[in-house]
Amino acid sequence: MERGPTVGAGLGAGTRVRALLGCLVKVLLWVASALLYFGSEQAARLLGSPCLRRLYHAWLAAVVIFGPLLQFHVNSRTIFASHGNFFNIKFVNSAWGWTCTFLGGFVLLVVFLATRRVAVTARHLSRLVVGAAVWRGAGRAFLLIEDLTGSCFEPLPQGLLLHELPDRKSCLAAGHQWRGYTVSSHTFLLTFCCLLMAEEAAVFAKYLAHGLPAGAPLRLVFLLNVLLLGLWNFLLLCTVIYFHQYTHKVVGAAVGTFAWYLTYGSWYHQPWSPGIPGHGLFPRSRSMRKHN
């Protein structure tokens, strides 16, 4: 007889708690959606600015040229000074894989949502295939340079003993060290990835301006690419501060910039190429049609 009101009050309290939690979840989802929308809009506007993109090239050059001077003002025992640090192993050594995964998803969504054409989507994704070929070709070229300029040494307590072994393979097989001119492949790859990602992500501003579908998944993928681009900039700075010789880093960055210029700055503007980012995605304005 006395338990009825108690049970009813308990059920009422439970209902109110569930309703309160439901409202809280809705508010949190609304806030997350608003932040996602605002963040993607601002990042797209920033990366889509031609002036800021030119300044970005100057920023990368300054990082590589003047960044090594910071080694005299930073703690040499920090985690980023170790070759075995988490970021170096998990991200820098696999930078192209991370870039292809994140950027490939972004290009796939942007191109397909804008055109609904598989052939056009495949053409734009082929830029990543070209990038992979550039990365592989550059890596082999760097190894060839090291082979052609190197000599075989045996470490001794008194110093180094020079051996007349003909190539690096036989030198390493004998347990010795091969020392040649080593272009920084990490500096090359990070520079190339930074320029490539900035170029590809810049198209999102124009995509939004044309009112094309831009739901939460696409905006989230875009922001993940922006975060990865920021990480590459940070790790490039760490690389030039803590690792490699100065000229090795400068040459690596110069080759990465030259590779970007040959592809995005030159070849992709030709009709027989994969095309520049955004090519064929957006309807031409009436004024352009009248002008033509």
From Swiss-Prot:
InterPro entries: FIT (IPR019388), FIT1 (IPR046402), FITM1/2 (IPR046401). Its main location: endoplasmic reticulum. Keywords: Endoplasmic reticulum, Lipid metabolism, Membrane, Transmembrane, Transmembrane helix. It is a multi-pass membrane protein. PANTHER family: ACYL-COENZYME A DIPHOSPHATASE FITM2, FAT STORAGE-INDUCING TRANSMEMBRANE PROTEIN 1. Predominantly expressed in skeletal muscle and at lower levels in the heart (at protein level). In the heart, mRNA expression levels do not correlate well with protein levels, suggesting post-transcriptional regulation in this organ. This is Fat storage-inducing transmembrane protein 1. Disruption phenotype: Knockout mice show no significant differences in heart size or function. Belongs to the FIT family. FIT1 subfamily. The active site is at residues 186, 244. Residues 40-54, 116-141, 209-220, 271-292 are cytoplasmic. One of its GO terms (molecular function) is diacylglycerol binding. The chain crosses the membrane at residues 19-39, 55-75, 95-115, 142-162, 188-208, 221-241, 250-270. The record marks 248 as: Important for catalytic activity. The keyword Nucleotidyltransferase does not apply. GO terms for biological process: fat cell differentiation; lipid droplet formation; lipid droplet organization; phospholipid biosynthetic process. Plays an important role in the formation of lipid droplets (LDs) which are storage organelles at the center of lipid and energy homeostasis. Directly binds to diacylglycerol (DAGs) and triacylglycerol. It is found in: Endoplasmic reticulum membrane. GO terms for cellular component: endoplasmic reticulum membrane. Residues 1-18, 76-94, 163-187, 242-249 are lumenal. The gene is Fitm1. It comes from Mus musculus (Mouse).
